């Protein structure tokens, strides 16, 4: 058995089974290597989307840096075998400056870079992240950091935007109207998880506070908003407000829809509310879709 010098890292590696590199015969420089994905011939079909998923990368949402989860894609002509996927990351790095600003204009610029670098007609991106914002307790006005989940979706073909979407998921309180109606006192309440997917005007810029407008529609129509910090006067207000505004899941999504339909920069929306029922072992949910 071969003895290795265990006082060195290389010796320890070989002691645990590492071997020397094989002296091969294939090229070792980029210019000499075969570039298979750049092969051009008839590959039968065009591909609408090909790219990468689950790329974690820093993003800026308003004043906070957070982690974004990206999916990038481009189209692929039928006479090309594949795309050069490393160019996707190169395009992302080109737009990096302490995080990619999560706004539609920034994502549009990123897609144009990707489109040109990949030499393809179409490109798309979906990116999810945690949106942090200031939230004040309702009576004592104590500031703390609240959060919601956001997902941006954008796609372009040539110079035209073909998809422009924003999804927000936030948690609220819902108090059961039936429980309030039949009980001598009190009513059961629970945490509701509300998801709004808004299909935005593809031909115009969004208004400055578009996220806040959608979030307000989701939260203000619930029995109560969730707060990071509540003192006793705040808790009293929250409890009483919930009792004054009972909501079924059906009620909540209809009220949210009534607000969203008034926004001329929204072309349509999908809404879902799922209640984690406090008196059942199952959840309750409601869902609706609307297109103008």
From Swiss-Prot:
Gene3D superfamilies, sorted: Urate Oxidase
GO molecular function, a single term: GTP cyclohydrolase I activity
Presence of the UniProt keyword Hydrolase in the record: yes
Pathway(s): Cofactor biosynthesis; 7,8-dihydroneopterin triphosphate biosynthesis; 7,8-dihydroneopterin triphosphate from GTP: step 1/1
E.C. numbers: 3.5.4.16
Chemical reaction(s) catalysed: GTP + H2O = 7,8-dihydroneopterin 3'-triphosphate + formate + H(+)
Site for May be catalytically important, residues: 176
Enzyme type, top EC level: hydrolase
GO BP of this protein: tetrahydrofolate biosynthetic process
Key words of the record: Hydrolase
Keyword Kinase in record: no
InterPro entries referenced in this protein's UniProt entry, alphabetically: GTP_cyclohydrolase_FolE2, GTP_cyclohydrolase_FolE2/MptA
Pfam families: GCHY-1
PANTHER family for this protein: GTP CYCLOHYDROLASE MPTA
Family to which the UniProt record says this protein belongs: Belongs to the GTP cyclohydrolase IV family.
Purpose of the protein: Converts GTP to 7,8-dihydroneopterin triphosphate.
Protein's UniProt name: GTP cyclohydrolase FolE2
Organism taxonomic ancestry: Bacteria, Bacillati, Bacillota, Bacilli, Bacillales
């Amino acid at each position: 058995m071969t003895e290795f010098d265990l006082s060195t890292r290389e010796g320890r590696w070989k002691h645990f089974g590492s071997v020397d590199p094989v002296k091969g015969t294939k090229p070792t420089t980029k210019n000499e290597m075969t570039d298979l994905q750049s092969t051009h011939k008839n590959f039968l079909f065009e591909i609408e989307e090909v790219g990468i998923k689950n790329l974690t990368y820093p993003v800026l949402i308003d004043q906070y840096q957070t982690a974004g989860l990206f999916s990038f894609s481009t189209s692929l002509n039928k006479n090309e075998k594949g795309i050069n996927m490393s160019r996707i990351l190169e395009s992302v790095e080109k737009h990096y400056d302490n995080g990619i600003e999560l706004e539609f204009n920034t994502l549009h610029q990123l897609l144009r870079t990707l489109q040109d670098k990949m030499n393809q007609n179409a490109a798309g991106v979906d990116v999810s992240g945690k949106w942090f914002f200031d939230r004040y307790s309702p009576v004592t006005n104590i500031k703390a950091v609240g959060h919601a989940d956001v997902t941006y979706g954008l796609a372009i073909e040539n110079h035209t935007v073909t998809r422009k979407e924003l999804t927000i998921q936030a948690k609220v309180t819902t108090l059961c109207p039936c429980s309030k109606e039949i009980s001598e006192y009190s009513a059961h309440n629970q945490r509701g998880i509300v998801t709004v997917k808004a299909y935005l005007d593809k031909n115009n810029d969004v208004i400055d506070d578009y996220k806040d407008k959608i979030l307000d529609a989701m939260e203000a129509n619930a029995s109560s908003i969730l707060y990071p910090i509540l003192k006793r006067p705040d808790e009293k207000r929250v409890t009483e407000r919930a009792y004054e505004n009972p909501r079924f899941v059906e009620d909540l999504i209809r009220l949210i829809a009534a607000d969203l339909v008034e926004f001329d920069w929204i072309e349509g929306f999908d809404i879902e509310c799922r209640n984690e029922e406090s008196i059942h072992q199952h959840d309750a949910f409601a869902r609706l879709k609307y297109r103008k």
